[in-house]
Design a protein with these regions (language model features):
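N-terminal low-complexity or amphipathic/hydrophobic leaders
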Residues: 46-103
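Bacterial signal peptide processing site
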Residues: 19-21
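C-terminal motif of bacterial Sec signal peptides marking the signal peptidase cleavage site
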Residues: 15-17
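Contiguous hydrophobic, core-forming segments of folded domains
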Residues: 85-145
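Short, hydrophobic/π-rich interface segment
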Residues: 164-216
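Bacterial N-terminal signal peptides that target proteins for export
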Residues: 1-7
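Mid-length scaffold segments of soluble, non-membrane domains
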Residues: 122-177
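C-terminal structured interaction module
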Residues: 208, 213-240
């Protein structure tokens, strides 16, 4: 009887030990996303003011983030710990400044320090292609997550919000007043993206799993990415 109790006790310890090992092996090397505010509240409720000051984010190592500037006066991007603000200067020019002293009505950010590099197949050309490919490649991965694309584009369309001061917003059409589009051609770029199947209307649009911001290699152009024609790019996914 005593021997049976000892054997049962040992078996319990083995099971607990195995569970502990499995928990450790399943632990991800990258942190959860941080989500502040919501796109739908900006578009439909007119919540344009600051929900987060970017300089309040303390851990800037491997930091990535995207969102609009407060009161929809520009676009924001954090790329590997560097923060950029883009603003409209004319219908064909913009001003891109590197600074953390800014804020956003909604923003998504994460720290990623290790990446898995994947050569994109030549069949992946558009934003929808990227979305589908990323979804398929990460079906067993921890979600949501940040990712990036680096390489050359044949064409791209980006926009910068430029809402007139004092404008009241209660619909997407009103929110996009002053939005200015910029066409890019044959540029080397980085695209920072965030993927989720569960945050439509929060940090992705209602018809997409991804939200993307693009910055050119020379850091002279940056904005929200609307259209894309890839020449040759590599995909970077957070390394488990």
């Amino acid at each position: 009887m005593i021997n049976n109790k000892i054997i049962l006790g040992l078996l319990a310890l083995v099971v607990l030990s195995c569970n502990s090992i499995n928990k450790k092996s399943n632990k991800s090397n990258y942190n959860d996303l941080h989500i502040v505010g919501a796109m739908k509240n900006v578009m439909w409720k007119g919540e344009l003011g600051s929900s987060i000051s970017l300089d309040s984010i303390s851990d800037k190592q491997g930091l990535y983030g995207i969102g609009p500037e407060s009161y929809l006066t520009g676009e924001l991007l954090i790329n590997n710990g560097k923060s950029y603000v883009s603003r409209v200067t004319s219908d064909s020019t913009m001003f891109v400044q590197q600074k953390f002293d800014t804020s956003a009505p909604f923003f998504v950010y994460a720290n990623v320090n290790k990446w898995e590099e994947i050569e994109l197949p030549q069949s992946i050309r558009t934003i929808k292609d990227v979305e589908k490919y990323v979804d398929e490649k990460t079906i067993k991965n921890k979600r949501p997550f940040a990712f990036k694309l680096i390489g050359s584009i044949s064409k791209a369309l980006i926009h910068i919000q430029n809402l007139p001061e004092g404008t009241k917003v209660s619909s997407p059409d009103e929110a996009h007043q002053g939005q200015t589009n910029y066409f890019l051609k044959n540029e080397d770029v980085e695209v920072i993206g965030f993927f989720s199947t569960e945050h439509k209307g929060v940090f992705t649009h209602h018809d997409s799993y991804i939200h993307l911001h693009l910055i050119t290699k020379d850091e002279q152009k940056m904005g929200h990415l609307d259209e894309l024609e890839i020449n040759a790019m590599k995909l970077y996914l957070p390394k488990e």
